[in-house]
Swiss-Prot record:
This is Hydroxylysine kinase. It comes from Mus musculus. Its main location: cytoplasm. GO terms for molecular function: hydroxylysine kinase activity. The active site is at 229 (proton acceptor). Belongs to the aminoglycoside phosphotransferase family. One of its GO terms (cellular component) is cytoplasm.
Length: 376
């Protein structure tokens, strides 16, 4: 959902390419003739869905792509963007439903271009990925079993990334990256975006508790590379038939690796729980199913489990505070930026009203019920 830590300068950093400029980029950088192009929603970069015109000779090459233009802040770290591309290719080779990376005419995975897109000449990183079919899970009714599978997928992804090796892997140590859960205290700089209200009081309490109860235990968490943004718009599903002939939604795509950084297993499961709660009609129940799926691959330790409730609240706080702050920068993008806020504040309040003990009881009992099913 984000791609940089330099939020203070982001007001002038977001690309504002016209469709004609984007089409010209596709042709000049990648050598494709565009038949149709349409903008896609984005937090602080610019994305276009691109249809490629094919000649009379038919090929098996894809005809739909996503052109991704990074903001000027992120464009200053080309090695990090290139690393994300390498991860996408690695995971695809390992069998995960990620996009394919399109190479430029110069046989690179990214290109740095300088252009005036309306606010003076600036440099932007450009890349293109294959367009993945499917609908965001935010748009479909998700069953308990599917929540379990999503939790399992998140753990499998983190597990697979243990085998990813690259000389620049240290780039994922993004110390001041606002979207890394470890950096919840950095939210204090953005609290001015919230009016004095119960919402603000809850976030202030979350930050205080995070410093006292999570920061002191980080050394006890197991480290890994996190996707960091497995939200309900970054997981795509397609309808397929089950063995019984019923239509079921299967994961068909994993999107947006822009928030990848070193974190911890428990961070990933907390992030997934939080985002799967957003559109749920019974949000408090979600955590147990996600946790059961995740723990079928990577069981959490007692210390990690104890931190889970506060980490879910912390991710809600990150998302809600930064959405409010971003709306001040990009009021024209308010509808997209406030997706989480439509239900997020209500869910965060409910978590706090119920309290950690009551919520954990629901989550852990639900997760335990899967263990008994498996052992039968």
């Amino acid at each position: 959902m984000s791609s940089g830590a330099g939020w203070q300068s982001q007001a002038s950093a977001k690309p504002v390419f016209t469709e004609a400029q984007a089409s010209a980029l596709v042709e000049s950088v990648f050598g494709f003739k565009v038949s149709k192009i349409q903008p896609l929603p984005s937090y602080e970069d610019q994305n276009f869905r691109v249809h490629i015109a094919r000649g009379k000779e038919t090929t098996d090459d894809p005809v739909e792509y996503v052109l991704k233009i990074s903001n000027t802040e992120s464009s200053q770290t080309p090695e990090l963007i290139e690393m994300q591309n390498h991860v996408i290719m690695f995971l695809r080779a390992a069998g995960f439903p990620t996009a394919s990376v399109c190479r430029t005419k110069g046989d690179n995975t990214i290109s740095l271009i300088s252009i005036d897109s309306g606010s003076g000449v600036k440099s932007y990183l450009v890349r293109m990925l294959t367009y993945l079919p499917g609908r965001p899970i935010a748009e479909v009714a998700i069953s308990h079993q599917q929540l379990y599978e999503i939790g399992r997928l998140a753990a499998q992804l983190d597990k697979a990334l243990e085998e990813f090796h690259h000389p620049k892997l240290s780039l994922f140590h993004r110390e001041n990256f606002i979207w890394n859960l470890k950096n919840v205290p950095l939210l204090e700089k953005y609290m001015g975006a919230l009016s004095q209200s119960r919402n603000r009081e809850i976030v202030e309490q979350v930050i205080r508790m995070f410093k006292e109860e999570v920061m002191t235990k980080l050394s006890h968490f197991r480290e890994c590379i996190n996707h960091g943004d497995l939200n309900d718009h970054n997981i795509l599903v397609d309808l397929s038939k089950s063995a019984s002939g019923e239509g079921v939604h299967q994961v068909s795509g994993i999107l947006d690796f822009g928030d990848m950084s070193y974190g911890y297993y428990v961070f990933e499961v907390a992030i997934v729980i939080m985002y799967m709660m957003i559109e749920s009609t019974n949000p408090i129940q979600v955590g147990g199913h996600i946790l059961a799926g995740f723990e079928s691959v990577i069981p959490l330790t007692a210390v990690e489990r104890q931190a889970l409730f506060l980490l879910v609240c912390s991710r809600f706080s990150q998302s809600l505070v930064m959405a409010a702050y971003s709306c001040q920068l990009y009021p024209e993008n308010k509808e997209y930026l406030m997706i989480t806020a439509k239900t997020g504040w209500k869910h965060l309040q409910q978590l706090f009203d119920m309290g950690q003990k009551a919520v954990e009881e629901i989550w852990f009992e639900t997760a335990k019920s899967y263990e008994s099913e498996i052992s039968m």
